Amino acid sequence: GECEQCFSDGGDCTTCFNNGTGPCANCLAGYPAGCSNSDCTAFLSQCYGGC
């Protein structure tokens, strides 16, 4: 999905999450379309130390 793509394209957490407006923003809201549970867990752990 676009969330994973953001990171694989070299985006960082600021870019990919962008305070709730980036392609990974949905991860923060509970894994809707474009982010699987495992993707979000990995990204959130990477970005926020397991938040």
UniProtKB/Swiss-Prot annotation:
Q: Which Gene3D superfamilies match?
A: 1.10.10.190
The record's subcellular locations are: Secreted
Q: MF terms per GO, please? A: mating pheromone activity
Give disulfide pairs as residue numbers: 3-24, 6-16, 13-47, 27-40, 35-51
According to its UniProt record, where is this protein mainly located?
Answer: secreted
Its cellular-component GO annotations read: extracellular region
Q: Which UniProt keywords apply?
A: Disulfide bond, Pheromone, Secreted
InterPro entries, A to Z? Pheromone_Er2/Er23_protoz (IPR016057), Pheromone_Er23_protoz (IPR016056)
Record function comment: Mating ciliate pheromones (or gamones) are diffusible extracellular communication signals that distinguish different intraspecific classes of cells commonly referred to as 'mating types'. They prepare the latter for conjugation by changing their cell surface properties.
Name of the protein in question? Mating pheromone Er-23
Species of the source: Euplotes raikovi
From which lineage does this chain's organism come? Answer: Eukaryota, Sar, Alveolata, Ciliophora, Intramacronucleata
